[in-house]
Amino acid sequence: GVMIIGGECFYHCFTRPAESANGNTNCPHCQGKSPSGEVARLVNRVAAAVKKTGTHKALYAWPYSAWIWSSQDPAEVEWVSGLDANVSVMSNFDGYDENVGPGGGVRFFDYNITCIGPSTTFARQAAQCRKMNRPVFSKVETCTTPEAFFLPYLPLPQRWQARLEAMKATGVAGFIGQWRFFGMNASPPEELQYRAIWEKDSGKALETICRRDFLLDTDGVQETLAAWQMLSDAWEYFPYSAMTSGERAGYMRGPFYLGPAHPLIFDVQDSYNLPLSFRLLRGDAKEFASPEEFEELQRKAKPRYVSDLLVTLPFGLERYLELLRQCRSQWQAGRERLRSILSGRGERAERELGIVETIDSHLRTLENVVKFYQARDVLQNTACGSEEFRKRIEVLQKIATDEIANAERMLPVLEADPRIGYGYCYGPVYDAEMVRAKIAQCRFVRDEELP
């Protein structure tokens, strides 16, 4: 079994104590004791009990969000060192370091593919496990990330391959690779995963996929690999943050998540008669609520779209747009190169192009939403004459026109591939009807509200 012993799930006195931000607890018995030592002691007792029910049974302890109680042991090395041999350590491979790349200024949380890994925390835990002659296991994402649950996989094959090679080099004995353990989608990154597990040398896996799925010759294979590399390199500039992933909700909200279904809000007090699908709760809400509570939650649900610029935190508006434009520019170059190779190469090739096109559309929506709200706020908050006022209106209308075109181009993509927007983990993210509703809303803003 797997038990999360950090800040959720398997509760103990240090899980999330009230009014404590530094690892203390309000439990009179545990007050003043070492959180790492006490949590290790509890896990050891559970592991011993598990073994009594069958010596073949294994227990994996996962310190997910343990930063809540590990301020004095930030890499949880003391906790690892206190574990009995009956306990196996499983930890996040890519989390909790500060991004030192182009998108610097944020700390990696949960799962991403910007950081290949291992993180400092995982590397230190792995080193401690080696000292104790114990295996170390990891929890990673191997095909997509939380901000992109609208796709079965992110088409960044070299980044996924580098992650798997890094896991091998770090000595990872095994891993769980899907959010909520949802299973496999038969995606190219998952094939890389299988080959990395079962083949001693999986370095030619991408070439195999190109020849088999796209029926390419040697030159075509090399061109495809080069195009994929451009896409993988573009992701260095993706403005990764909790706000991009889901704004104040943390996950599953905002312009990158909803992409071509995300509206452009001019009047923040107007719901624009958008259908209920724009306010649906995330799919796991039913797991912790009774039917009556769920109905109440749904009635009070906030929109899944956003109407302000909090999404640009902590970068600030100008830096956010700079990163986004760099990411988009490189992505478009890779997309065009891939399109020149794969167009007309069969169903699998067309599906790959559709996935790449979808990311391009979501990045374009993200930029348009940020630019629209920036221009809207200038219009609403800065005095100007009538001529300047008209120019500002025209800027907003131009952005709306571009976003309408962006959404319209996604309709045939959605028609061709039901995986896009499906949301296999938490329920539908968006569909063609939501995109059409968004297009109608943007036309209303452009053609009626702004004039």
Where are these regions (language model features)?
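Substrate-binding groove of N-acetylhexosamine-processing glycoside hydrolases
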Residues: 30-451
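Active-site groove signature of glycoside hydrolases
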Residues: 1-32, 242
